[in-house]
């Protein structure tokens, strides 16, 4: 069968390539363009039983379709455009159907060893006002995440099956000394008996024109604290003790440490506690010396630099040391042995958990577990140190941590995907290493897109309890602190053996607004998806249960928050 491409009329006979016939193009057909009207040969198009191109089919009309003339009078260009649009639409829909349902499961490649950590260097905390989350806003992606839950649950179950809270092997004192020869040469074995803080006098060999802070690394790398050190520099010579032509300066370490955790309210605790007249903190809120600066880590993304000597760390307590020195001098003049009640504190929220630098300095001879931890060195010098810990539901802590440190593209969807990726990476490590090895694995911590490991409180606390007694800890919950600030602060005062406050001082401390609240732009993002929350509760559940057992307090299981 043959047809006219111009007017689609049927032509006979079948074997002819050119034929003259009468025009049947209809009233609107252009007879000047039709070969039949002009007596010209008609151009034929063969239609057979073979599969035909889609565009060619639209240019052919078979018998009995004359009623479709109105549709077929579209220009060929418009018809082609319509067909191309339909094809593209079909391809897009087919692509979504084939791959869309699975794309949320596409996570990064398995665990690999990488370079130096790139996690944020600032370890800050969360305030009580951020404990409550915003109302839930549904998302299309949340539906597909729910469908993915069984697969993610398998990962969580795999991790839980390998959780073993084993006892770590403790290093002896000689091993510690070999690692930090200079530190052990600077800090003495005994401290002044008349000071609550661990202090001692050391000889200063410089002149009155000598700048004692000239080479301090905290000054060199941070412009923010130069004014503080300028003040210290001007008053330095007047706070020396002069005996038999020699000059001595008072050196001090903290009496207590706020050791963690980040995004759990440590900043708020710090701000309220420093209002007490008997408490003095370091010149910098979070020196991060024990965990980072003594290894030469200024910012994690910058890699290693020169190590900060212990003298630079001790300089941070000179303001407090000056006040303690004045009190000691006054007591000496009165010939009394009255205890100086000023205590020094330090509030680096990385102290409890961050041991990422160990792989660069210590021999890996313990199956991936660090042979030395931060608490080993603190205990070697200060076996009677007091330790404050503020904790929070680790599920909410992780989301707050994500909102604080993520720089762009923050959303509940992005958080869910990062959590899923981090869980897979953690499982991959657990397939080959112990729980402790994975928790302290620098490469893994660097690879995970969210700091999943920071919420494993039980692992860290159990390791701290290998060197310090439980009585040396005061462990608080942010949820309790948020609901009753006055009560938690009184517990802190009692733990640190601080004197009572006046009514005015107490009102100022308890009624001050919360510190370091969540940024407005982060609040507008709302909470995490319920399915993400469920996944994290499943993951952290066994660790929370163990923590509650250690502390003998079910509140730390966070079963209801």
Curated annotation (Swiss-Prot):
What is annotated about its quaternary structure and interactions? Homodimer; disulfide-linked (Potential). The relevance of homodimerization is however unsure. May interact with phosphorylated proteins in resting B-cells, including HCK.
Q: Which residue stretches are annotated as topological domain Cytoplasmic?
A: 1-80
- UniProt record, GO biological process: hexose biosynthetic process
Q: Which PANTHER family match?
A: CARBOHYDRATE SULFOTRANSFERASE 15
Task: List the top taxonomic levels of the source.
Answer: Eukaryota, Metazoa, Chordata, Craniata, Vertebrata
The record lists its disulfide bonds as none
The record's top EC class is transferase
Q: Gene behind this chain?
A: Chst15
**Annotated TM spans:** 81-101
What's the protein name?
A: Carbohydrate sulfotransferase 15
Q: What is its EC number?
A: 2.8.2.33
